[in-house]
């Protein structure tokens, strides 16, 4: 069973995405801020992380940078899932090592699951 960590501060969205991934056979953990999300990555060792950018305690960009700096975590693919869609934000996310940059408004939860499966099948 593939493991996914969803780091999202909006409880409605995190529950919605979690339910969709569970329905598709994933083991899911959820975190609501960047700091606890980083700790959860280390403990849970997910196959992929879905990461919001606007988060309390540590934003998604800072967290992504910390994940990619850690030897034991840097191979875990991180997908940014956010409403921030400016070109400079997308470029920053990719430059920091994000596998993919998904703008929430452009993707249904089903499409997000399909994209995650596509990424995991490439690895």
Predicted regions and their residues:
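Conserved acidic carboxylate
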Residues: 8
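The feature encodes the CheY-like receiver
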Residues: 14, 56, 65, 74, ...
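Charged docking surfaces used in two-component/phosphorelay signaling
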Residues: 15-23
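Short hydrophobic/Thr-rich beta-strand motif most characteristic of the beta2 strand and flanking loop
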Residues: 25-32, 40
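Hydrophobic residue at a beta-alpha junction
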Residues: 31-32, 55-58, 67, 76
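Active-site residues of response regulator receiver
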Residues: 52, 82
